């Protein structure tokens, strides 16, 4: 609610100390972690704003400095990542070399594309991809590729349709930046945009980003032109983090192969 021209305050998680806030034109959403002091102390910090309290069933509680979920620390997952990534890198090495040569022959510039993405805990890392566009974009104005995007090269369209451009991320897996399965990492500009509009967005940082994920095998692959599409992807990411198991990882990997045979959302 709004009173006397002040924005309303929505306590998303009844806890303290305050973790972070997100704002919109008419609401301040307050996130918090563990209840370590009386709720009245937390509300005292908001004394200049009218306050509405309400439960949230969507928020996956963030625990700064606390234990990470199993998906982030299970040794079996890391062993599977390293062994599988090493084997796949050796298997696809000839294909990657041919793709890199085709990229260099078609357009000037490097064969590899590097971009900052958010990893485990939101820590930045440099993601690796085969370059599929004529120009390199980064920063606050980075734009997602659209169907018929004239920035994408002819070779790039082939690589993107079969997700071959993502194969260099096997090196990210070997380095520990990523996992075979997990939430797909987004450009930092997109992280900033969607985290301001989706309160539970940051929960996806509780797992290493993946080459593939539950959202992708559910058909949520490709661009996210609307906030609602991103909400669906985030819901799948949180579902994966909360219900992770090694067996589920294996099933997602197996389901990824047939999902690559359709190019409906690959452009």
Swiss-Prot record:
Alphabetical keyword list: Cell membrane, Exopolysaccharide synthesis, Glycosyltransferase, Membrane, Transferase, Transmembrane, Transmembrane helix
Gene Ontology terms, MF aspect: glycosyltransferase activity; undecaprenyl-phosphate glucose phosphotransferase activity
One cellular-component annotation, GO: plasma membrane
Catalyzed reactions per annotation: di-trans,octa-cis-undecaprenyl phosphate + UDP-alpha-D-glucose = alpha-D-glucosyl di-trans,octa-cis-undecaprenyl diphosphate + UMP
Recorded topology in the membrane: Single-pass membrane protein
Transmembrane segments: 83-103
Subcellular location: Cell membrane
Catalytic class of the enzyme: transferase
Keyword Ribonucleoprotein tagged: no
Keyword Ribonucleoprotein on entry: no
Domain of life: Bacteria
EC number(s) from the headed UniProt entry: 2.7.8.31
One Gene Ontology term from the biological process aspect of the record: polysaccharide biosynthetic process
Function description: Is likely the initiating enzyme for holdfast polysaccharide synthesis. Catalyzes the transfer of the glucose-1-phosphate moiety from UDP-Glc onto the carrier lipid undecaprenyl phosphate (C55-P), forming a phosphoanhydride bond yielding to glucosyl-pyrophosphoryl-undecaprenol (Glc-PP-C55). Also possesses a weak galactose-1-P transferase activity.
Protein family membership: Belongs to the bacterial sugar transferase family.
Note: Complements colanic acid (CA) synthesis in the E.coli mutant lacking wcaJ. Can also partially complement the O-antigen defect in the S.typhimurium wbaP deletion strain.
Protein's name according to its UniProt entry: UDP-glucose:undecaprenyl-phosphate glucose-1-phosphate transferase
Gene source species: Caulobacter vibrioides (strain ATCC 19089 / CIP 103742 / CB 15) (Caulobacter crescentus)
């Amino acid at each position: 609610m709004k009173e006397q021209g002040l924005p309303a305050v929505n306590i998303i998680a009844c806890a303290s100390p305050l973790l972070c806030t997100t704002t919109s034109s008419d609401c301040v959403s307050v996130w918090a972690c563990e209840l370590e002091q009386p709720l009245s102390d937390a509300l005292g910090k908001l004394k200049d704003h009218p306050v509405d309290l309400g439960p949230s069933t969507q928020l996956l509680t963030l625990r700064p400095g606390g234990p990470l979920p199993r998906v982030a620390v299970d040794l079996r997952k890391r062993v599977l990542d390293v062994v599988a990534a090493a084997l796949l890198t050796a298997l696809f090495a000839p294909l990657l070399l041919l793709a890199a040569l085709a990229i260099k022959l078609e357009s000037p510039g490097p064969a590899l594309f590097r971009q900052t993405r958010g990893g485990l805990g939101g820590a930045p890392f440099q993601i690796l991809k085969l370059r599929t566009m004529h120009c390199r974009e980064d920063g606050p104005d980075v734009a997602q590729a659209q169907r018929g995007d004239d920035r994408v090269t002819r070779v790039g369209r082939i690589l993107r349709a079969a997700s071959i451009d993502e194969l260099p991320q096997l090196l990210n897996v070997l380095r520990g930046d990523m996992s075979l399965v997990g939430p797909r990492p987004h450009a930092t500009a997109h992280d900033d945009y969607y985290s301001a509009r989706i309160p539970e967005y940051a929960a996806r940082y509780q797992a290493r980003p993946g080459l593939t994920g539950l959202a992708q095998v559910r058909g949520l692959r490709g661009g996210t032109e609307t906030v609602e599409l991103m909400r669906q992807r985030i819901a799948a990411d949180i579902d994966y983090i909360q219900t992770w198991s090694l067996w589920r990882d294996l099933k997602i990997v197996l389901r990824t192969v047939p999902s690559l045979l359709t190019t409906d959302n690959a452009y």
